[in-house]
Amino acid sequence: QADCVMVSIHSHELGGLRKDVPAEFLVTFARACIDAGANVVLGHGPHVLRGIERYHGGAIFYSLGNFLFENDTTTHQPADFYEKYGLPHDAQVGAGMDCRSKNGTVGLGVNPNVWHSVVACWSMENGEIGLIKLHPITLHQELPRYRRGLPALTEDETVLHELAELCKPFGTELSIRDGIGYV
C-alpha cells in the first residue's frame, strides 16, 4: 500500500556498443515491474543518461545519469587500489586517481556526458504518472577536482535536447520550455 511504488535498478550493461542505450534485459525487466504494479522504475549505473519511456501509466527512466560524481575526492581506497597502480599504501587518493586516469586523459572523467544530467519530478494522477518535469543540472567538469562533482541547476538546455533524442526510440516525446523538459 503506497501512493507511489518506485523500483531502483543499478545496471551498467549496454544496448549494443552504446552506453546511453539500455540492454534488452533491462527494458524487459523495467516493463515487467510496471506490469507488476510499480509506478516508476529508476535506472542508474552507466553514469550517463538513457531514454525515458511512458509505459502502461508508469514511467521508466532507463538511467538518470549522475547526480553526484565525486570519485576523485574519496578519502580512502582499499589496499589493492594502491597496489594496482604501484603506489605506497600511504599515498594520497588523488595520486591513485591521477594514475588511473593518466592525469585526466582517459576514463569516465573525460566523458562530458557524465558531468550533466537531470533532476526528474512528476505528479500522480489517479494512481498513474502525470506530467514529468526534467530540470537540467551540471556537475561542473571544468572545475578543479576538489570542487567538481556536486550538482547545480543550469540554464544550458543541451542535456535536454540530447535526452529528447534518447527518448525517441521508446516513443516518448520530450518538449522543452523555459529551460525545463516535459514528458
What are these regions (language model features)?
Residues V21-V118:
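Conserved beta-sheet core of the metallophosphoesterase superfamily
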